[in-house]
Each structure stands twice: as C-alpha cells, then as structure tokens.
Amino acid sequence: MVTIRADEISDIIRERIEQYNREVKILNTGTVLQVGDGIARIYGLDEVMAGELVEFEEGTIGIALNLESNNVGVVLMGDGLMIQEGSSVKATGRIAQIPVSEAFLGRVINALAKPIDGRGEISASESRLIESPAPGIISRRSVYEPLQTGLIAIDSMIPIGRGQRELIIGDRQTGKTAVATDTILNQQGQNVICVYVAIGQKASSVAQVVTTLQERGAMEYTIVVAETADSPATLQYLAPYTGATLAEYFMYREQHTSIIYDDPSKQAQAYRQMSLLLRRPPGREAYPGDVFYLHSRLLERAAKSSSRLGEGSMTALPIVETQSGDVSAYIPTNVISITDGQIFLSADLFNAGIRPAINVGISVSRVGSAAQIKAMKQVAGKLKLELAQFAELEAFAQFASDLDKATQNQLARGQRLRELLKQSQSAPLAVEEQIITIYTGTNGYLDSLEIGQVRKFLVELRTYLKTNKPQFQEIISSTKTFTKEAEALLKEAIQEQMERFLLQEQV
C-alpha cells in the first residue's frame, strides 16, 4: 500500500505556487452599434485615445476619430463587410505607425506600408508614427541648395530649393504629373531619395508612372505609395502621411528627399466623405472645418534640417487640380497659402503646343534665387523680365497694324525664348545644358534662325559642347559659376556650331 507523505505533497504544492504566474490583462473593449459606409459606431471603449487603432473581432483595423458622450466613431481601414452589429471591438493602445527601412526603395506600397507590387514582403526593424510633429524653428535652417527639376522654365525662373514646398497647380490634362515625374528622373545621381504618393488616381495612371520610372532606372531611389480611386476613403486619407513618414525617415538620417503628393485635393475629398459620415458639421464646399489643418500638418513636415540635425532635407511638391482654371476655390487657396510658391500650368498654353505649359507670369517661388547656383543666377537673371515684356507686347501687337523695327526685334526674340523653354516629356536637362540653352537665347544668337529651327539647333549645340568642349561642363560643375573662361568656350562653340548648322540647312 502506498503511503502518502504530507511533506512531499506540501513540497509539490509549494513548487506549483512558486511557478504560478499571475497575469492580469486589462482590455478596453466595446460593442458595435452600427456599421456601414466605412464607418462604425461603437458603444464602450471608454478610455480610447483620439486617433487610436482599434481591432474588430474579425481582424479589421479602424481608427477612433470621433469621441462622443455615448459612442465612438471609428473609420475602417478596409471594407468591413464581415463586421456584424453586436460584435466586440478592442482598443490596441497604439497610434497608427508603419515600418520604415532602406528596403522600401524601389517598391510600390499601400497606405499601410504593405507591398502591392507582388515582389514579396519588405523587411524592416524600425517603425515610425504616421502622424509625427513637424520640425520646429530651431530644427530648421533656410533653404539654400537647389533641387534641379531638369525643366528650364522652372530651374531658371521658378527655382525650387531642397526643403521647400512648391505647389504644382493646373487643370486636368495639363502635364502636372509629367512635371513631377521629370523631377524624379532628374534626381538620378544627385543623391536624392524620391517618394511619389498617388491618392485616388486611376490604377492605370499609377502603373504608367511606375513603368516610366522603371524604364529610366529611377525606381532604384524611389518609393511609390499608391491608394487608387477604388480604395477606402480612410486609406486615401492616410496615404500622404505614410509617404511623409518614409521621407522623414531618410531626412533624419541626413539624406535629401523629395516627396510628390498627387493630389491633396483627392485626400481632402476622402476626408470630407469620412467627416460627413461621422456627422461632423460641414463648412465651405461641405469640407469640414479642419481641412486646412489636414494639409498644413502634412506640408509643414517638409523642411531643411539644421546643421545640428545633419542638414537632411525633405522637399514637398503637392499637385492640385483646378476646375477650369479657378485658383480661388477652397482647396487650391488653402494649399497656396501653406506652400512657398506655385507653378501654374495653363490649359491654353498646353493646347497651343507650349509644353511644359508653365504660365511664368503667375508662377512664383518664394525662395527665389537662394535656390539657384551662381551660374544660373548670372545667365537667367533677365529671362523672366524679357518674357514678361514679350507677353505684354504680343498682346498689344495683335491690335497694331505697323510696328517699328525695335518692337519687331523684341517680338522675334521673345518667340525664340518661348521656343527654348519647350521640352519633351521625360527628357530633363542637366543644369550645364540649361545654362547653354538660356545663354544662347538671351544673347540673341537664335535671332537669325527660323522659329522651327531653334530646338534642332539647341539639341545639336548641347551635343557639340559635350563632345568637343567638355571643359565647359567641368568648369560649371566644379565652380558652380559662369566664369569668363566658360563664357569664352560657349561663345566659340555657338559660332562654330552655327556655321555648321547653317551649311547643313542649305544642303
């Protein structure tokens, strides 16, 4: 018969008591009262934070936006088709954040930083909050380095600096996205990381942009964040903040970044949809009262870091679509007042064959020549004034029957200057090539040519200089100044090429 020993039993009980780990889990839960149109009303969740992520029973994630006395309004990050009335919801205790790493370069992701290009998962050890505060005044320094777009009209007259926010605005189909993609293509070899955020665009348009970037080898330094027109409003609202978070990650690692938002007016529409469904009071054009803050907190994150923070930069290029040229609508005026200047694209110029269709008269950069190299300042200083005078004269000349010789010469010069600003899509020019082009036009070397010959001559001149006078490019890139020596080389090349060109044309 087995004898029961009391000390053995007490030892076992003691051992079990020592091993017992008392864990108390406190969950903040609630119940779904109502769900539909991407919005859920939750009863409970008493201690939820504004902007906190909540998880539904079937796995959908939402963001608590409306904290009311008797319920919580949650926007869903998904279709929410499986959520049922009466099902439970728990607060996660986390604010929306995404993983960040170098591995995102060359990838196409959605607003939750999940890859959508079918090339597998992205490994990341760090994460950042989607909504993070913009750098303060002490953390910034004034913009002083240029961000070359490769477009003569912009780099010479509406220069963009690293850390600036420049709005690209115009009607639909005026080449706004083309300006942005050319800017990305021109950053090749410039050590600038680009982020392109497509908000509410057609999937085919986004695919076209990605294909262009891949063909030109620009995806190596680019991240594409895409939420197409069929995405839930919540994800379209979040996409720009996801892009900004990725750009910020590189900025704080002392790198230069450029971010394109295409376009914030679609984000505002998604936010309006969410706000109206949450029963927030509508304001002008039915947008909620805080739609200005929606864009200001996004665009204020673009900055040029101080030397203490490593002088990284984040340049923002928001693209806003206008309706039949109405720049005074609500969203365009909001974004104009937040940014440091705007590039206005005109449908009339576009249809007249002037592409990029930049209306130089009403476009402006509030950073100005601080964002240009000295050589560009020296050469392009009087270009904007000459074009403005030409536009005025051209309007006047329509009504005048006989014009004096000086006016005719000025009109002829203006037409040739306008011609040299034309560029093909996806063909950005290096700053040295732009200097060659502008100098040739402003100093009257094109006056003897027919308007139809101008572009052909300039292409051949740039090629001739590259092959026969490589010292010119070396002087500009090393000194950043248009020296006497560089000018002499350029004059010599123009004369030599002009003789060759005129002989060719006669044959």
From Swiss-Prot:
Catalytic activity line of the entry: ATP + H2O + 4 H(+)(in) = ADP + phosphate + 5 H(+)(out)
Primary enzyme class: translocase
Main location as per UniProt:
plastid
Gene3D superfamilies in alphabetical order = 2.40.30.20, ATP synthase alpha/beta chain, C-terminal domain, P-loop containing nucleotide triphosphate hydrolases
Presence of keyword Cell cycle? no
Q: Which UniProt keywords apply?
A: ATP synthesis, ATP-binding, CF(1), Chloroplast, Hydrogen ion transport, Ion transport, Membrane, Nucleotide-binding, Plastid, Thylakoid, Translocase, Transport
Q: Name one GO cellular component term.
A: proton-transporting ATP synthase complex
**Any one GO molecular-function label of the UniProt entry:** ATP binding
**Residues at which ATP binds:** 170-177
| Database matches in CDD domains | ATP-synt_F1_alpha_C (cd18113), ATP-synt_F1_alpha_N (cd18116), F1-ATPase_alpha_CD (cd01132)
Subunit info here reads: F-type ATPases have 2 components, CF(1) - the catalytic core - and CF(0) - the membrane proton channel. CF(1) has five subunits: alpha(3), beta(3), gamma(1), delta(1), epsilon(1). CF(0) has four main subunits: a, b, b' and c.
PANTHER family per the record?
Answer: ATP SYNTHASE SUBUNIT ALPHA, MITOCHONDRIAL
What HAMAP family has UniProt attached to this entry? ATP_synth_alpha_bact
- The identity of this protein, by name, is ATP synthase subunit alpha, chloroplastic
The source organism is Morus indica (Mulberry)
Q: Which gene encodes it?
A: atpA
